[in-house]
C-alpha cells in the first residue's frame, strides 16, 4: 500500500508521466518504490518543511523572476542555418550551429570528459583547453592544446588563472572573429561576463555556456539577470536546455520541475538574420544531463 500522500497525488493528477515525474522529484530518484517507507516519509517531511519557509507571495515573485529570465533567454532561429548536436548524446553534448572549417575553439573547464572538444579537434579545428582542476587533457589529439589554468575575471585574477584578454594575447588571437567558446566554470562565468568588454565578446562567433545559480531564491539573482541582458546586446540565444541535475535542490525549495543551471547556445547577433523559434523545448537535439531523471520541460515561448 502506498503512503496516503502518494495516493492523493495519484488521485489529483491523472497523467501517468506527470505523476511519475512528481514522485521522482519528491524522492530524488527514479526507483523510489523500493525504498523503505520511513525514508520516503522523511524526505517528504523535509520538502514540506522547506516549503513552509516561503509564503504564496514568495512563490509568485519567484515565478515572475523566472518569467523575466525566460524572456531574456528566448531562443531564435538563424535564417539559413540549422542546429546540430555536437559531442556526447548525454551530458557533454550541446546543440549549436555546425562549425565551418578553420575555426578556433576555446574550452574553458575541459574536465575529465570533454567529448565536444574531441569532435571539434577531429573536424580540424584548433582546440585550446583551459582547466586548472585536472593534470592533462582528457583526450589526446594533435589539434588539442591543453593549459592547466582556470579562468577568472580581471578583478579576480591570480598567478594561476587566466583572463579572456590574457588568453587572446598569449595565443595571438586579438582581433580574431572566428572563435567558438564553450564554457562551464561552475559559477565563475558571472564575473567573467560582467567584466568582459564588448570588443572581446564580439570575437566569439558562438558561445556555448552553462549559466549556474539561476534560482530566484539564490542571492544575486537580479545581478545575474543584468549580466544576461548585457550578453544579449551582442549575442542571440539559439538554443536553451535546463540541466536536470538541479531537480532535487530546487524541489526542496518548492520549485518543482525547475533547474537552476541553463545550457545556452548563442551566436553573434551581427552574423545572422533571425526569426522566432516556435519549437517546444526540450527538442530532439536535447538529452537529459542526468539520464536517471526526465528532462525539464520548458515548452514554447
Task: Please annotate each region the language model reported.
Residues 31-99, 112-113, 158-177, 213-301:
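Rossmann-like AdoMet/SAM-dependent catalytic core
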Residues 81-159:
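SAM cofactor-binding core of SAM-dependent methyltransferases
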Residues 101-103, 125, 175-179, 203:
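Short coil/turn segments at beta-strand junctions that form active-site/ligand-binding loops
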Residues 108, 130, 181-183, 209:
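Active-site flanking residues adjacent to catalytic metal/cofactor-binding acidic residues
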Residues 111-115, 180-192:
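Short acidic, Gly/Ser-rich segments with clustered Asp/Glu that frequently serve as metal-coordination loops
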Residues 191-214, 218-228:
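A short alpha/beta connector and helix-capping loop motif
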Amino acid at each position: 500500500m502506498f503512503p496516503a500522500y502518494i495516493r492523493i497525488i495519484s488521485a489529483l493528477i491523472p497523467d501517468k508521466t506527470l505523476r511519475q515525474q512528481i514522485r521522482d522529484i519528491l524522492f530524488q530518484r527514479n526507483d523510489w518504490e523500493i525504498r523503505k517507507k520511513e525514508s520516503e516519509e522523511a524526505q517528504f517531511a523535509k520538502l514540506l518543511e522547506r516549503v513552509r519557509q516561503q509564503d504564496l507571495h514568495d512563490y509568485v515573485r519567484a515565478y515572475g523572476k523566472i518569467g523575466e529570465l525566460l524572456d531574456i533567454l528566448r531562443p531564435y532561429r538563424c535564417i539559413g542555418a540549422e542546429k546540430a548536436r555536437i559531442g556526447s548524446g548525454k551530458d557533454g553534448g550541446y546543440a549549436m550551429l555546425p562549425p565551418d572549417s578553420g575555426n578556433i575553439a576555446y574550452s574553458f573547464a575541459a574536465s575529465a570528459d570533454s567529448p565536444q572538444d574531441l569532435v571539434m579537434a577531429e573536424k580540424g579545428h584548433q582546440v585550446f583547453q583551459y582547466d586548472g582542476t585536472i593534470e592533462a587533457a582528457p583526450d589526446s589529439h594533435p589539434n588539442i592544446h591543453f593549459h592547466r589554468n582556470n579562468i577568472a575575471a580581471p578583478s579576480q585574477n591570480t598567478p594561476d588563472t587566466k583572463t579572456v584578454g590574457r588568453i587572446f594575447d598569449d595565443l595571438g588571437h586579438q582581433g580574431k572573429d572566428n572563435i567558438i567558446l564553450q564554457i562551464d566554470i561552475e559559477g565563475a562565468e558571472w564575473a567573467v561576463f560582467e567584466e568582459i568588454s564588448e570588443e572581446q565578446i564580439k570575437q566569439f562567433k558562438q558561445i556555448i555556456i552553462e549559466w549556474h545559480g539561476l534560482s530566484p531564491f539564490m542571492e544575486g539573482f537580479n545581478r545575474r539577470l543584468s549580466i544576461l541582458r548585457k550578453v544579449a546586446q551582442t549575442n542571440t540565444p539559439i538554443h536553451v536546455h535546463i540541466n536536470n541535475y538541479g531537480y532535487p535542490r530546487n524541489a526542496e525549495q518548492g520549485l518543482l520541475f525547475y533547474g537552476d543551471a541553463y545550457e545556452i547556445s548563442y551566436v553573434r547577433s551581427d552574423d545572422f538574420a533571425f526569426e522566432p523559434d516556435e519549437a517546444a523545448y526540450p527538442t530532439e537535439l536535447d538529452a537529459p544531463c542526468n539520464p536517471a531523471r526526465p528532462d525539464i520541460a520548458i515548452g514554447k515561448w
